[in-house]
């Protein structure tokens, strides 16, 4: 089950599912055949859509060249979307703080990981919790 106790789909669990892995393999096969593959999402803003937060991140890990077609027609890379996530969730990341002075500040990589988790929490498909009978 990919749903966590809070009732939303946990993308860290989804990526471990056989169906998800098979889907990634199908994309690899299609690319190996030189198909031009486009994945459509429901949201105009990719950072609000699982295609970027779930799929885009995993496709980058698998070596795909991921570009998001924006509403206006321009393209954004997954790296550019990660910058947007950092700006949204860690807008004060470049400020001098006691933690940064003491060497306890989060690394950029950790902030990106946390940003994906926070975005997942916001956009993950939700189900009603079943009450124990």
Predicted regions located by residue number:
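Residues lining hydrophobic/aromatic ligand-binding pockets adjacent to catalytic sites
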Residues: 1-133
